[in-house]
Amino acid sequence: MPKQSEKISDSNKKNIAIDEKFSIGDIEILPFSIPHDAANPCGYTLFSDNKKISIATDIGHMNNNIIKNIDGSEFILLESNYDPEVLKCTKYPFKLKSRIAGPTGHLSNQVAGQTIN
């Protein structure tokens, strides 16, 4: 049986704010807003030793704010999780298909590829 996770101590918790940098060790982290159907979703850009890495998951659509924040990154992690044509053919209910492909749902594989290029 898996061991139950221990409670995270309050000293190891930190509230973060969109567009306000914070640090963990020598890594500066900048949270940036992303469109998704959740409370205050964000992506992150990490800076250390003159290097820049960006991470953004659960993106409903690509926008100028995301592009601005990931621009110049040496490594970009974007989540994309559907092909529009395959999604159309699934047995998912219309409401779920609409949520996935909607402006606050998820990024298609095609849009993620176009963004990286």
Task: Report the location of each language-model feature.
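Cap/insert and terminal regions of metallo-dependent hydrolase folds
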Residues: N64-N117
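Core dinuclear metal-dependent hydrolase active-site scaffold
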Residues: A17-F75
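Active-site HxH/HxHxD metal-binding segment of metal-dependent hydrolases
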Residues: M1-K21
